[in-house]
């Protein structure tokens, strides 16, 4: 080829081969169990006097637990040193809830904000709350809703006044649309160890615009968009603590009312081209319970024309070949799996198991004792199940996988890390699992995710157009 060097030709072939491999990875039948053993910190909590917990200068400076909530904005220093977190505040993403904690004095639940740095055109007031847990006192927790925001716009905001004032910024997501590109990060079972810090530092290099947490933010029970996990339950009657999920409910607001949910434990949001559903394994979900009825209606309301990517978050995996917590998600699978297949859910993320694992597209909805079909079977309409419970918890990694590796398991490894899902358009997204490896983010499991709805929808549309064309010709004869 004139004007093209041999090196360029080789590079093109390499890229093409790589794409063909990634594009066909869903069809591979041989699962992989990685034997990799990387460096890791001891699974112990970071001491409270560590610099990541240092209070910023200034009297009564706002602060918050540095394990933030969905979505992630700004830069690493913002996350690790200022402890203010935000979460989506409504159904479509043009509202945010800003949360922080003050100690000593309650201060004011007020946020000044605008689209120019240090020029705050608007003021929003929120509410302050606090709670106790045995001998622990939470401090003063502030939640302020900023709504009617412009899409795809950078906002600057200020919390506090005088010496205690702190200034930050966030970026609102693009307007909802079928071909809006967007990059999500996924982290589960983060905890507050040195491995947790390593995961966050690696994650900050990923370029993700928002982070989806899969539960177990803290392990203080021995003390998220955000999903609740078993370590948030905190039901301890021997300490006269009988309100489950107390800390979670006080600290991490969710926009559950916007999706007509009766509980902050399960809810849905739309962001860019994705419709994200968050479920609770630790709330009732069987037939006729509030969560069951809500999910049934929410799935019917999903608009795949505008949000083609349907993503479900939960804490306990429905499919896992790890010895730890084996089959714990079976009850929820038995109740909801058929719905997920019928509605062509693209991917389901879970945590709980402190390792990484990805499945093929499989389902077990044909299970019948009399038929002998006891095991999951390939199902093109089923979601891919991904366990990302390797954020850095204090309990260590779950390295005992079951053997032989089940046919439904595509890749599994017991290492700390995080994932990213980069939506490109209505039909394709790129997925990466990144292992924490010697100070670098290392992609180790990657594939192209094909949208479940649009390929069949396009075929049906072409068929309808063809039939109408044929009918038109017949009518004209």
Placement of each model-derived feature along the sequence:
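Generic N-terminal leader/processing signal
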Residues: 3-6, 27, 156, 463
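Intrinsically disordered, low-complexity cytosolic loops and termini enriched
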Residues: 35, 41, 45-50, 57, ...
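Classical eukaryotic N-terminal signal peptides for Sec-dependent ER targeting/secretion
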Residues: 1-16
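Metal-dependent phosphoester/phosphodiester hydrolase catalytic core
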Residues: 31-36, 48, 67, 75-398, ...
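N-terminal signal peptide
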Residues: 2, 17-42, 67-73
């Amino acid at each position: 080829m004139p004007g093209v060097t041999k090196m360029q030709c080789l590079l093109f072939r390499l890229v093409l081969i790589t794409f063909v491999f990634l594009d066909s990875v869903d069809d591979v039948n041989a699962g992989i169990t990685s034997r990799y053993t990387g460096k890791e910190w001891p699974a112990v909590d970071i001491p409270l006097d560590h610099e990541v917990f240092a209070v910023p200068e200034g009297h009564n400076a706002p602060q918050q637990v540095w394990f933030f909530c969905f979505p992630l904005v700004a830069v690493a220093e913002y996350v690790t040193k200022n402890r203010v977190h935000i979460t989506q505040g409504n159904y479509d993403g043009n509202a945010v809830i800003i949360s922080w904690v003050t100690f000593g004095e309650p201060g004011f639940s007020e946020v000044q904000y605008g689209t120019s740095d240090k020029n705050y055109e608007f003021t929003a007031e929120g509410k302050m709350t606090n709670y106790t847990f045995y001998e622990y006192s939470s401090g003063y927790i502030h939640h302020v809703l900023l709504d009617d925001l412009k899409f795809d716009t950078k906002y600057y905001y200020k919390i506090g006044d005088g010496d205690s004032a702190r200034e930050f910024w966030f970026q609102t997501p693009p307007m909802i649309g079928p071909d809006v590109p967007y990059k999500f990060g996924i982290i589960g079972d983060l905890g507050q160890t040195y491995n947790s810090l390593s995961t966050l530092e690696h994650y900050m290099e990923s370029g993700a615009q928002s982070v989806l947490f899969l539960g177990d933010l803290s392990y203080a029970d021995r003390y998220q968009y955000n999903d609740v996990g078993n370590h948030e339950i905190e039901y301890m009657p021997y300490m006269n603590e009988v309100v489950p999920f107390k800390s979670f409910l006080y600290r991490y607001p969710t926009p559950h009312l916007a999706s007509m949910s009766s509980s902050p434990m399960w809810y849905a949001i739309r962001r860019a081209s994705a419709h994200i559903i968050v479920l609770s394994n630790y709330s009732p979900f069987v037939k006729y319970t509030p969560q069951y009825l809500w999910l049934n209606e929410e799935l019917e309301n999903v608009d795949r024309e505008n949000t083609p990517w349907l993503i479900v978050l939960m804490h306990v995996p429905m499919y896992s070949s790890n010895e730890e917590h084996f089959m714990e998600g079976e009850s929820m699978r038995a109740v909801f799996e058929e719905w997920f297949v019928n509605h062509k859910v693209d991917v389901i993320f879970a945590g709980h198991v402190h390792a990484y694992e990805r499945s093929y597209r499989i389902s077990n909805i044909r299970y019948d004792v009399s038929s002998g079909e006891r095991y999951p079977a390939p199902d093109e309409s089923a979601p891919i199940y991904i366990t990302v419970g390797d954020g850095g918890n204090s309990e260590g990694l779950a390295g005992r996988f079951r053997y032989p590796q089940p046919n439904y398991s595509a890749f599994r490894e017991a290492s700390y890390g995080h994932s990213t899902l980069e939506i490109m358009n209505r039909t394709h997204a790129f997925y990466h699992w990144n292992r924490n490896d010697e100070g670098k983010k290392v992609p180790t499991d990657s594939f192209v995710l094909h949208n479940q709805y649009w390929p069949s929808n396009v075929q049906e549309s072409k068929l309808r157009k063809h039939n109408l064309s044929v009918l038109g010709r017949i009518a004209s004869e």
